[in-house]
Amino acid sequence: MSARHFLSLLDFTTDELLGVIRHGIELKDLRKRGVLFEPLKNRVLGMIFEKSSTRTRVSFEAGMIQLGGQAIFLSPRDTQLGRGEPIGDSAIVLSSMVDVVMIRTHAHSTLTEFAAKSRVPVINGLSDESHPCQLLADMQTFVEHRGSIQGKTVTWIGDGFNMCNSYIEAARQFDFQLRIACPEGYEPDQRFMALGGDRVQIIRDAREAVRDAHLVVTDVWTSMGQEEETARRLAHFAPYQVTRELLDLAAPDVLFMHCLPAHRGEEISQDLLDDPRSVAWDEAENRLHAQKALLEFLVEPAYHHA
């Protein structure tokens, strides 16, 4: 049996995604009650980082330990990935020593090349194309607070980059309407827009985009690797700051999410994370629980069919 990978939300069926989310909620409850649950005892997660991280590293490392396993952190200084050794060769060797691999990288092609040669599951911890693990946490957070997201309206405000791409995939997989509010020149790649079909639309006016929305989401205006564009981006995105007043135009039960870290005074107002409609802290914690469910889903079948 070949290994299952999680490089994008499209790698799982809708039922599988919903099952992972439900199990993430169960694992969260077990942890809060102090119940020991170690289905991945003696399993090892290899974590390859080409980009710095706080939430991704801590959530995966802590999650694997809580499931009874262990995690190995590999920084660019620790590996030959893409430096002298072909990615496929690294995948063959590393996947013979660990039970699952998580990669946080720049080029999405690194993930696909690694997965093609890996004998164990590979997880996308973030690439320049998508961030599916964050979407698992976001969808779990919405389900916990509001129930099913099917048929709801979600507004993405900001850059049409990797997080936005994953929201387009989520609109397809979870069947919700997605409005994208962004300046001209910052739209998502046409491949993703085509994927979203009639579930996705671009609206230039942020106020119009949030009207009656059930979920409003944003992210930083300048991602890692784009620092030289900061001044230009600040000018272009200024009309897209999410404030309490903007949320007032959304549905009465609207939720606000941000994958963090947040730049207060830029993409959000200084006080927005303190607004009762913000669930950003729950969202951040749910990275731990959703990814534990994902690890169990991927590693246990791979182990039993080995």
UniProtKB/Swiss-Prot annotation:
The keyword Cytoplasm applies. It is an enzyme of class 2 (transferase). GO terms for biological process: arginine biosynthetic process via ornithine; citrulline biosynthetic process; L-arginine biosynthetic process. Its EC number is 2.1.3.3. The keyword Methyltransferase does not apply. Its main location: cytoplasm. InterPro entries: Asp/Orn_carbamoyltranf_P-bd, Asp/Orn_carbamoylTrfase, Asp/Orn_carbamoylTrfase_sf, Asp_carbamoyltransf_Asp/Orn-bd, Orn/put_carbamltrans, OTCase_ArgI. One of its GO terms (molecular function) is ornithine carbamoyltransferase activity. It comes from the Bacteria. Reversibly catalyzes the transfer of the carbamoyl group from carbamoyl phosphate (CP) to the N(epsilon) atom of ornithine (ORN) to produce L-citrulline. Belongs to the aspartate/ornithine carbamoyltransferase superfamily. OTCase family. This is Ornithine carbamoyltransferase. It comes from Pseudomonas putida (strain ATCC 47054 / DSM 6125 / CFBP 8728 / NCIMB 11950 / KT2440). The gene is argF.
